[in-house]
A protein has these predicted regions:
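Acidic/polar alpha-helix N-cap and adjacent early helical turns
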Residues: 140-148
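Catalytic cores of nucleic-acid endonucleases
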Residues: 127
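AMP-binding/adenylate-forming catalytic core of the ANL superfamily
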Residues: 3-4, 11-17, 26-113, 124, ...
Length: 148
């Protein structure tokens, strides 16, 4: 497939082991043997031993009226390892609150998956050239003390 990353020996060592490329994808196999890509390992929050897939939380939040963009990521926590954090860019003319977001999530997912930290952003979330959210930049930009 590939020999490695150009001029990035650390990245090569992390992703290729004994000739096998570890893509970082998380998948499930259904009862018929079909494989479904669920998320990426990097896009999973490990909260107190529970795996929380960012894509699952994002899909629930996107169903809430007034959400233009959202991105879920892990926030370091001394007790649980990570907590769920979400940055939301509301649609123009809408009024979202942390309480309304948590209430919506509580009706559609397990309690431990509900975001503890919620940031309502005044600008669109940062993206790369292919349109993916830059979660690392979001983490650096946001302060847990400013979350709702």
């Amino acid at each position: 497939m590939i020999k490695g990353y150009l001029n990035r020996p650390e990245a090569t060592a992390e992703s290729i082991t004994d000739g096998w490329l570890h893509t970082g994808d998380v998948a499930r196999i259904d009862e018929d043997g079909f494989i479904f890509i669920v998320d990426r390992v990097k896009d999973m929050v490990l909260r107190g031993g529970e795996n929380i897939y960012c894509a699952e939380v994002e899909s629930v939040v996107f169903k809430l009226d007034g959400v233009a963009e959202c991105s879920v990521f892990g926030v370091e926590d001394d007790r649980l390892g990570e907590e769920v954090g979400i940055a939301i860019f509301p649609a123009a003319g809408t009024t979202l609150t942390a309480d309304s977001i948590r209430a919506h999530c509580g009706n559609h997912m397990a309690k431990f998956k509900i975001p503890r930290y919620i940031w309502l952003m005044s600008e669109a979330l940062p993206r790369n050239a292919s349109g993916k959210f830059l979660k690392r930049e979001l983490r650096e930009l946001l302060d847990v003390n400013d979350a709702a």
